[in-house]
Every structure is written in structure tokens, then in C-alpha cells.
Amino acid sequence: MNKVVLLCRPGFEKECAAEITDKAGRQEIFGFARVKENAGYVIYECYQAEDGDKLIRELPFSSLIFARQWFVVGELLQHLPPEDRITPIVGMLQGVVEKGGELRVEVADTNESKELLKFCRKFTVPLRAALRDAGVLANYETPKRPVVHVFFIAPGCCYTGYSYSNNNSPFYMGIPRLKFPADAPSRSTLKLEEAFHVFIPADEWDERLANGMWAVDLGACPGGWTYQLVKRNMWVYSVDNGPMAQSLMDTGQVTWLREDGFKFRPTRNNISWMVCDMVEKPAKVAALMAQWLVNGWCRETIFNLKLPMKKRYEEVSHNLAYIQAQLDEHGINAQIQARQLYHDREEVTVHVRRIWAAVGGRRDER
């Protein structure tokens, strides 16, 4: 199995392909990407037969920006007979996966695939039963075993394969299912909520998104991102010349500062979170974020980088490399992750977490 399917946002196939070609090459796994415009997925075909499995084992999925999900697959199954689609699929997976922990029958996230998605949901139940009988799936769902993927690209036409549950997206089609809160001031609130789900392990939420923390929201108006922080009972400085939603101000948890987010300097030294979703050139935002991190003004940050029309992967890579270089220059250890989230459009969301030193007394430990 030498092919890896990567699901992505439709229209960003070239960026996804450029990224996987670059990062697979750094792992000395060579191949080429098959790209179809607006398909919502990319296929990376490795030159060596076993390299597909090697790639999804060795390259951290968390290091990918434009892929929502990935899995290794075999050859395309075509012309599945409508009266029995199950037998050929089971045949393709036998000997490839044994006692898988979960089945996901998926499609690309395109308008054309919506009808196909309805079929996939109905088809999952009988297929799961057949795969369990064949030993491809375990008799119960478990996160400790590989995930079995059946990926339909057209009616009667699918790829079959698997991903490793410790190195994939835990979400179906790589998309967290979030509901827009009726009392949120703007739909942008879902970007930050999704970022929390993608970047912060669920078992660390109570510690890292704790009650009573102090946070700053740069470019906050009307308060979509502030809403998420308030919902987690944080105290928030919302920085923007534009007005904040009255519903947020009424909570008593928000201090509205009518200032430019680029000029604001915090007066507290116990700020846990800084978030930022400003419409500005990505290099300018990256420089501001680096300044906050280098000065120890916050412990963690989530921010958006708006993408240019061309060379998007190169631009994001350059911005992330700049932040990393600034941190390295000042001897600061940090973890950087970036992802084009489902709720992002022409942008990517970045999470940076400073890793505290064991030696006390430094400003960045306050």
C-alpha cells in the first residue's frame, strides 16, 4: 500500500500537496502528489511499496497544516456491484488490517459528495458487521487499534485503508461537529472552539482552560473569541476600537480596552492566554505574536494568519519559521502547531505553547 489519502478544504489541494511532498521528502519518503482541483483531497503516491505505512507512522499528523485527515490505501476499487458492494471491500481489507478499532466510511467535504455522504452513513452499519465477521474489525470499538477507512470518491468507487489512532484526526472526515451557540456575537466563535478541540487534548482542558484564568483577545470586536473565553469562566481584556457585544459586557468578566491590538501592552504578568483574529498581513501578525511570546506576556496563544492568494504554504511556513527563530534566539522552548481548521476560510490557525523551564525565578514562569 503505497498511497496516502489526505483530506483537505476544497480549493487548497495544491497547498496540501506541496506540504506533504515537502514533509515526506524530509522523512526520506519520496513520491508524487495527485491533485484534482476542488476535489477536497490529495493522493500522495510513494515510490516504495511500504512507504505509505511508514509515512503515516513516522510523520506526526499534528505537524501538517492543510490536511484534515490522512490514511494509507491500496488500489481504487471501481464498479462495485450495487447488489453486493460489501464483499469486494472486505476482500481488499482482509490481510491488511486485523482487529481494527473503528470504521469510518467517508467522502470528501464537497457539495457534490453530500448525496454520497447519506449513502455512506446507511452503508456503515452492514459493512461494520461484515468486517467484524471477517476479523478486519474487532467486536468492539477501541482507540488502541487502527482505524479502518473506506473513502468513496464516487458512487460504486472507493479506496480502502487505515490510519493509526495515535497519529490521525480523532474526528469523522477530520471535522469536529460543533454547534453554533445562539448567544454568541459572531460565527467566528466556532474557530476558537475548534482550535481548542484540535490543539488541546481533552484531558488537559481543566488545567489549561481553567476557571479564573486571565486572557487577552486582540482585535476582539464584536466578541466571538472573547465569548469562548468567558464561557470557560476566564477574566478577559478585550482589545479593539470597535464595540463589544453588550451580552459579554454584562457578564462582568470582560474589560473592554479601546486600543489598537498592535500597540496594546499588558500590565498584568499572569496572563495565561492571548488570542488574536485580526485581518492583517500574516507577517505583521507573526511579528506581534513573536513579541508576546518572547516577552513572556502570555503562556499560550491561538491566532489566525490570513493567507495570500498565491504561495500560501510557503507564506505560512515562512511565518512559522520566523516565530520559531525568534523563540530560539531568546532561548525559549515552545511547541508550535498550525492547522487550517474546518471553520477557517482563507486562513490558518496557529497554536503556540511556551514550555516552562525547571529552574524558577525567570519572568516567563510568573
Curated annotation (Swiss-Prot):
The keyword Flavoprotein does not apply. It catalyses: cytidine(2498) in 23S rRNA + S-adenosyl-L-methionine = 2'-O-methylcytidine(2498) in 23S rRNA + S-adenosyl-L-homocysteine + H(+). Pfam families: FtsJ, RlmM_FDX, RLMM_N. One of its GO terms (molecular function) is S-adenosylmethionine-dependent methyltransferase activity. Transmembrane segments: none annotated. S-adenosyl-L-methionine binds at residues 188, 221-224, 240, 260, 277. GO terms for biological process: methylation; rRNA processing. One of its GO terms (cellular component) is cytoplasm. Its main location: cytoplasm. The active site is at 306 (proton acceptor). Keywords: Cytoplasm, Methyltransferase, rRNA processing, S-adenosyl-L-methionine, Transferase. Its EC number is 2.1.1.186. It is found in: Cytoplasm. It is an enzyme of class 2 (transferase). Monomer. Catalyzes the 2'-O-methylation at nucleotide C2498 in 23S rRNA. Belongs to the class I-like SAM-binding methyltransferase superfamily. RNA methyltransferase RlmE family. RlmM subfamily. This is Ribosomal RNA large subunit methyltransferase M. The lineage of its organism: Bacteria, Pseudomonadati, Pseudomonadota, Gammaproteobacteria, Enterobacterales. The gene is rlmM.
